[in-house]
Amino acid sequence: MSSSLPRSLLRLGHRKPLFPRYNTFVNSSVITHTSLLRTRLYSNGTGATSGKKDDKTRNKPKPLWPQVKSASTFTFSGILVIGAVGISAIVIYLILSELFSPSGDTQLFNRAVSMVEKNKDIRSLLQCDDGITGKERLKAYGELITNDKWTRNRPIVSTKKLDKEGRTHHYMRFHVESKKKIALVHLEAKESKQNYQPDFINMYVDVPGEKRYYLIKPKLHPVSNSKGFLGIRWGPRKD
């Protein structure tokens, strides 16, 4: 009994499988192989179609109008930028030359006004209220074009001319005002060969009811008194 019991237990516990094991492995390998073939075929088909579409889009000619439009806009914007930079450079150069150049109207005006303010005779003609504590400050401005009292709306009148030697002459006119009187200042400056600043060659002040006062008198060139026929002296030279 003891020997037959374990055999029966073994018979009951261990049952043979209905299908052999090698069949399951074969079936699984076949399924995986067919699925891989399907995925490869699907991928190859889609890749071919996408490649054909890309080739068509690449080979398709682009329209000409957008290219012309983009090129024209780029050229126009470049011209605008270059023109704006050029105009800005010219304006900056003119402003700097006018304000800081020794031959500019601003520098000439400041020099002339300082000369008028320091002159005692002109201050007496203008009846300035000068005392021990201080001196009256004069107002200097340009032409009275409008009735506006603001000095910034009164521009300075100035002109430039070239002489026979090719040097520039500056002509300027402005007003000087005290509390009691107003004077008109005339200035003539000439380009200097030695200095950066033009030389004042003529400057005078006109006060209403007073005689003209010269701060700088012009140099008169002597005229040779030539006697003789056709302005030529005939005969021996007299030493």
UniProtKB/Swiss-Prot annotation:
- Its transmembrane ranges are 76-96
Glycosyltransferase in keyword set? no
Q: Which domain of life is it from?
A: Eukaryota
Topological domain (Mitochondrial intermembrane) residues are 97-239
Give the misc comment. Answer: Present with 3770 molecules/cell in log phase SD medium.
- Organelle targeting sequence: 1-70
Q: Which InterPro entries match?
A: Tim21 (IPR013261), Tim21_IMS_sf (IPR038552)
Cellular location(s): Mitochondrion inner membrane
The membrane topology of this protein is: Single-pass membrane protein
Species in which this protein is naturally found: Saccharomyces cerevisiae (strain ATCC 204508 / S288c) (Baker's yeast)
Q: What is this protein called?
A: Mitochondrial import inner membrane translocase subunit TIM21
Keywords of this protein's UniProt record, alphabetized? Membrane, Mitochondrion, Mitochondrion inner membrane, Protein transport, Transit peptide, Translocation, Transmembrane, Transmembrane helix, Transport
Task: Identify the Gene3D superfamilies for this entry.
Answer: Mitochondrial import inner membrane translocase subunit Tim21 (3.10.450.320)
Q: Where is the signal peptide, in residue numbers?
A: none
Which PANTHER family would you find in this protein's record?
MITOCHONDRIAL IMPORT INNER MEMBRANE TRANSLOCASE SUBUNIT TIM21
A Gene Ontology cellular-component term: mitochondrion
Give the Mitochondrial matrix membrane side ranges: 71-75
Function comment: Essential component of the TIM23 complex, a complex that mediates the translocation of transit peptide-containing proteins across the mitochondrial inner membrane. Required to keep the TOM and the TIM23 complexes in close contact. At some point, it is released from the TOM23 complex to allow protein translocation into the mitochondrial matrix. In the complex, it acts as an antagonist of TIM50 by reducing preprotein accumulation at the TOM23 complex and promotes dissociation of the PAM complex from the TIM23 complex.
Family stated for the protein in its record? Belongs to the TIM21 family.
- Quick check: keyword Transport in the entry? yes
The residue stretches assigned to a coiled coil in this entry are: none
What's the chief localization of this chain?
Answer: mitochondrion
Subunit composition and interactions: Component of the TIM23 complex, at least composed of TIM23, TIM17, TIM50 and TIM21. Interacts directly with TIM23. Interacts with TOM22 component of the TOM complex. Released from the TOM23 complex by the PAM complex, leading to protein translocation into the mitochondrial matrix.
The alphabetized list of GO BP terms reads: protein import into mitochondrial matrix; protein insertion into mitochondrial inner membrane
